[in-house]
UniProtKB/Swiss-Prot annotation:
<feature type="binding site">
    <location>
        <position position="179"/>
    </location>
    <ligand>
        <name>Mg(2+)</name>
    </ligand>
</feature>
<feature type="binding site">
    <location>
        <position position="178"/>
    </location>
    <ligand>
        <name>substrate</name>
    </ligand>
</feature>
<comment type="subunit">
    <text>Homohexamer.</text>
</comment>
<feature type="site" description="Transition state stabilizer">
    <location>
        <position position="74"/>
    </location>
</feature>
<feature type="active site" description="Proton acceptor">
    <location>
        <position position="49"/>
    </location>
</feature>
<feature type="binding site">
    <location>
        <position position="151"/>
    </location>
    <ligand>
        <name>substrate</name>
    </ligand>
</feature>
<dbReference type="InterPro" id="IPR040442">
    <property type="entry name" value="Pyrv_kinase-like_dom_sf"/>
</dbReference>
<dbReference type="Pfam" id="PF03328">
    <property type="entry name" value="HpcH_HpaI"/>
</dbReference>
<dbReference type="GO" id="GO:0005737">
    <property type="term" value="C:cytoplasm"/>
</dbReference>
<keyword id="KW-0479">Metal-binding</keyword>
<comment type="function">
    <text>Catalyzes the reversible retro-aldol cleavage of 2-keto-3-deoxy-L-rhamnonate (KDR) to pyruvate and lactaldehyde.</text>
</comment>
<keyword id="KW-0460">Magnesium</keyword>
<dbReference type="GO" id="GO:0106099">
    <property type="term" value="F:2-keto-3-deoxy-L-rhamnonate aldolase activity"/>
</dbReference>
<dbReference type="InterPro" id="IPR023593">
    <property type="entry name" value="KDR_aldolase"/>
</dbReference>
<dbReference type="InterPro" id="IPR005000">
    <property type="entry name" value="Aldolase/citrate-lyase_domain"/>
</dbReference>
<dbReference type="InterPro" id="IPR050251">
    <property type="entry name" value="HpcH-HpaI_aldolase"/>
</dbReference>
<dbReference type="InterPro" id="IPR015813">
    <property type="entry name" value="Pyrv/PenolPyrv_kinase-like_dom"/>
</dbReference>
Length: 267
């Protein structure tokens, strides 16, 4: 029988190790595999803002499977039915967006666990996650390999952060800088001093609660700052942004009047 896969990403978070990631928004398995050969610790495959279908996510999971980079799937929302599908195609680590309350966090955690610990629907014999029924006792042991991360990205979520951190089954909390800054009254300005202060205090609160703290920083200096504050899973770029910047930079070498890449401070 096939052995249940371990989750190196979750194990490293448990140990407090720093993991550097990359955001994948290009929606193709080809680009995902290129990224997986680069050496990033983790790759966020985005189903919220990138136009990924379940089948697209499935193909990208297949593409990165032979490599050391660990995939994290972000579905468009945290419904029980969508979480079930994403887990069944083999995702072991989920990042659920827009979690504002402890009750939402509990519902999401329940959706990732089989009964009696949760409400995940049973279908292991037709699921890639269970190797189509070939992993012995899959349902009994799968919880240990699942990693659940939730996004805190609104003023409401910040007000409820301590309660969210207390929810059993939540392994880490990710600060969403773009939506958070907009919610705080500073749209498209995650670098505002007040937003920066709140990001710092939030990261420190998350780590003090014994949870992993995550962030996406497309500016290298911001990534370094978040690491200094204690964030231990940080994405340092977005594939589509890096690609467009490289295209602009190359064209500017050969066409007069063309500007190089615009420096972007946020996602």
């Amino acid at each position: 029988m096939n052995a249940l896969l371990t989750n190196p990403f979750k194990e490293r978070l448990r140990k407090g190790e720093v993991q550097i990631g990359l955001w994948l928004s290009s929606t193709t398995s080809y680009m995902a595999e290129i990224a997986a050969t680069s050496g990033y610790d983790w790759l966020l495959i985005d189903g919220e803002h990138a136009p990924n279908t379940i089948q697209d996510l499935y193909h990208q999971l297949q593409a990165v499977a032979p490599y050391a980079s660990q995939p994290v799937i972000r579905p468009v929302e945290g419904s029980k039915s969508l979480i079930k599908q994403v887990l069944d195609i083999g995702a072991q680590t989920l990042l659920i967006p827009m979690v504002d309350t402890a009750d939402q966090a509990r519902q999401v955690a329940s959706a990732t666990r089989y009964p009696p610990y949760g409400e995940r629907g049973v279908g292991a014999s037709v699921a890639r996650a269970a190797r189509w029924g070939r992993i012995e006792n899959y349902m009994a042991q799968v919880n240990d390999s699942l990693c659940l991360l939730v996004q805190v990205e609104s003023k409401t979520a910040l007000d409820n952060l301590d309660e969210i951190l207390d929810v059993e089954g939540i392994d880490g909390v990710f600060i969403g800088p773009a939506d958070l800054s907009a919610s705080l009254g500073y749209p498209d300005n995650a670098g505002h001093p007040e937003v920066q202060r709140i990001i710092e205090t939030s990261i420190r609160r998350i780590r003090a609660a014994g949870k992993a703290a995550g962030f996406l920083a497309v500016a290298p200096d911001m990534a370094q700052q978040c690491l200094a504050w204690g964030a231990n899973f940080v994405a340092v770029g977005v594939d589509t942004m890096l690609y467009s910047d490289a295209l602009d930079q190359r064209l500017a070498m050969f066409k007069s009047g063309k500007n190089g890449p615009r420096i972007k401070g946020s996602y």
